[in-house]
A protein has these predicted regions:
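FIC/Doc superfamily catalytic core
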Residues: 1-13, 17-22, 26-28, 34, ...
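Short, basic, alpha-helical segments at the C-terminal edge of helix-turn-helix-like DNA-binding modules
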Residues: 38-39
Length: 309
């Protein structure tokens, strides 16, 4: 069977790539498959009929997570999110914990099944990530401020070996210079001003999916903390998606290469957002599929509405 890309199908049907991606994620294109990186669509696929705009009220993703967390529900989307998010975000940064070990820590609040040679920070930061996600669910509607971002860093790095180093500021901006690969980041003396400028810019945006992604690229370029910038940055994106009704996403280990390439391309000379946005959209597709797996149908986000989905 011959297959087409999202872009080829969009051109053929006269709609946006985002609409085609949504049709795929919602299972509305027969034979469409996701290979872990992109959707493959049969060349003879039929364009789905537009649905009526009259839809019953639906719960937001934030409301679902709040309810499942409050009920201490196991085996639901909240449970799955906590494990998958902590495992992938920490693993991207070098954690040695497996997915099963991460699940064990979340479900039992013990380390009984974790090997004796496992770095203690991998365990502590995993437990801290669970707390950070709980904090975000409880405070998602709060304004995004410097203090809020610092609070996430304090939660993530609290009790780690870094927290006992004189030069490491837990919950505060870096004191020493750091780099990301071959790219320079903001000097410690300039971080506060750079963060204030970033938040002022973001506050004037429409807080769309693209704005959240742009904030992340700019935040990672500043790299305001001594360590933990990637994880804090991804937590911030999660919070802002929940706040503004945008389908959230998890950057998985499988997406790692495309994620870092996307950041580099956006932050570099060409300032191209395409790869990073596509990577995040693939994550949204996976999250939407996970929601359907657990029987949830949620209200479309603002970007979906603009595309007429």
């Amino acid at each position: 069977m011959d297959y087409q890309t999202i872009e080829e199908t969009a051109a053929k049907w006269g709609i946006t790539s985002r609409q085609v991606r949504t049709y795929c994620a919602k299972g509305r294109i027969a034979g469409a498959t996701f290979d872990g990186k992109a959707w493959l669509i049969p060349a003879n696929a039929i364009k789905p009929e537009r649905k009526s705009r009259a839809m019953p009220p639906q719960k937001s993703i934030l409301a679902i997570l709040e309810a499942e967390r409050a009920a201490k529900l196991t085996g639901g989307i909240y449970h799955r999110l906590q494990i998958d998010f902590a495992y992938n975000s920490n693993h991207i940064e070098g954690s040695r914990l497996t997915h099963d070990q991460t699940r064990w820590i979340f479900e039992t609040r013990t380390v009984g099944e974790v090997g004796a040679d496992m770095p203690i920070d991998d365990i502590v930061e995993t437990a801290n990530h669970f707390r950070a996600v709980d904090t975000i669910i409880a405070t998602a509607k709060a304004a995004l401020t410097e203090n809020y971002i610092k609070r996430l860093h304090a939660i993530l790095k609290g009790g780690t070996t870094d927290s006992r180093k004189d030069w490491f500021a837990v919950g505060d901006y870096k004191r020493l210079e750091n780099t990301v690969g071959d790219m320079d980041t903001a000097k410690p003396a300039k971080v506060k001003a750079e963060m204030a400028r970033l938040l002022a810019w973001y506050g004037k945006t429409a807080h769309t999916f693209e704005d959240v992604a742009a904030f992340h690229a700019k935040f990672e370029a500043i790299h305001p903390f001594q360590d933990g910038n990637g994880r804090v940055g991804r937590l911030v994106m999660f919070k802002e998606c929940l706040k503004h009704g945008i389908t959230p996403f998890i950057v998985t280990e499988q997406m790692r290469r495309f994620y870092y390439m996307g950041l580099h391309e956006w932050q570099g000379r060409l300032q191209s957002p395409t790869r990073l946005l596509d990577t995040f959209r693939a994550g949204q597709d996976a999250f939407s599929a996970m929601l359907r797996h657990y029987g949830h149908t949620v209200a479309a986000d603002a970007a979906d509405a603009r595309d007429g989905r």
